[in-house]
Amino acid sequence: METLKTINFVIAVIFFVCYTYQFLYIPVPWLRKARPHGPAKDNRYAVLICARNEQRVIGDLIASLRGQTYSQSLLSIFVLADNCTDDTAMVARVAGANVYERFNQVQVGKGYALDFLTQHIKADYPDGFDGYFVFDADNVLSPDYIERMNAVFSGGYELSLIHISEPTRLLSI
């Protein structure tokens, strides 16, 4: 019986040691200082859109980007028509986007497409941008989306991620 008590005690000590550090995380929300949100800066942004056969919806996204309350002179829209067999590139050009086309049947997927697009943007726009937005071609944004995200970025947050669990046609924050 003493052996079982000893084994039980050793196991309890091991669990106690393994999980005690987690109690340090309990006061973290109360100790964290709020970041000051000063006035938003005028940042230059590039909007990256990788599209494959999205001619039906890409015009809506570009129109919602052109309708932003954020200054259009600080916003550049780039579309990569990736292995398209429809008129995605033409629709995006007519809507006012900077369009690149890629035809590569070996390196297929959004990762390759984004890499291709960012390499071309770096070469064609050596001054670069302060930040980047990546959207799917079927998104549509609320008119103040970029302005509100700029306020977050200007407040010191370098990365923002939005997960849409119940998708609607309008992205908003």
Regions found by a protein language model. Give the residues of each.
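N-terminal membrane-anchoring/stem segments of glycan-assembly enzymes
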Residues: M1-K41, V94
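Cell-envelope/extracellular polymer assembly enzymes that use nucleotide-activated donors
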Residues: N43-A46, S76
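Short, acidic, metal-binding catalytic loop of nucleotide-sugar glycosyltransferases
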Residues: A63-L74
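A conserved acidic beta->alpha catalytic loop
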Residues: A81-A89, N104-V106, V140
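Acidic donor-binding/catalytic loop of UDP-sugar-dependent glycosyltransferases
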Residues: D87, F135-V152
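Single conserved hydrophobic/aromatic residue that forms the stacking wall/gate
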Residues: I162-I173
